[in-house]
Amino acid sequence: MARRPLVMGNWKLNGSKAFTKELITGLKDELNAVSGCDVAIAPPVMYLAEAETALVSSDIALGTQNVDLNKQGAFTGDISTEMLKDFGVKYVIIGHSERRQYHHESDEFIAKKFGVLKDAGLVPVLCIGESEAENEAGKTEEVCARQIDAVMNTLGVEAFNGAVIAYEPIWAIGTGKSATPAQAQAVHAFIRGHIAKQSQAVAERVIIQYGGSVNDANAAELFTQPDIDGALVGGASLKASAFAVIVKAAAKAKN
């Protein structure tokens, strides 16, 4: 079954009102004639209004970088699924290593977020991946399986229908290091195979992105791999020209 690739930009803690408008204008110009690849951006939640307005008449989808479990009430500083939907958000990144590390989010907590997003009709982008120490100890598959099982064991394998997984080896995030295409493919194939133990149909449909210093120089080679269905892009998503190269590479490789 052919899977439609998804390239998503994670802006992290970057941007301003002016930057948001300028970058989206650039992306619309660069990607105007591109088809065959879904595209999304996840700006800081502060700039969702600017992004929603700037994305009018564009096929670029809006995402965000976090969500709370609660819909409303006395939860200071949090953002609900309903608030995100109010701005036209489609994709929500959860489980990013920076959230796991700095905010001590557990596999179980992330699985709850996954369920909340599914219930709200939003698309979870579940980040998984191992640290450098875990990689060197040969625990990559063990870590990825554990992080996926946290969702499957509580919500069932069918929860991955219409969801996205982003394999992001922690040692490659923002470091300039990247897994080789063959290394990334091996892990992506493992992830798909692990899900296939529960459901071959779900495994064949689920989008598995690669993330970890994806840029305009290495994207094309990564996308030649059969189980890499796009990318979750950090730093390179802050430049319209670089991000467009990545999107075009995915569209070309997968069509």
Swiss-Prot record:
Keywords: Cytoplasm, Gluconeogenesis, Glycolysis, Isomerase. Its main location: cytoplasm. It catalyses: D-glyceraldehyde 3-phosphate = dihydroxyacetone phosphate. InterPro entries: Aldolase_TIM, TIM_sf, TrioseP_Isoase_bac/euk, Triosephosphate_isomerase, Triosephosphate_isomerase_AS. GO terms for cellular component: cytosol. The keyword Cytoplasm applies. Substrate binds at residues 10-12, 174, 213, 234-235. CDD domains: TIM. PANTHER family: TRIOSEPHOSPHATE ISOMERASE. Belongs to the triosephosphate isomerase family. This is Triosephosphate isomerase. It comes from Histophilus somni (strain 129Pt). The gene is tpiA.
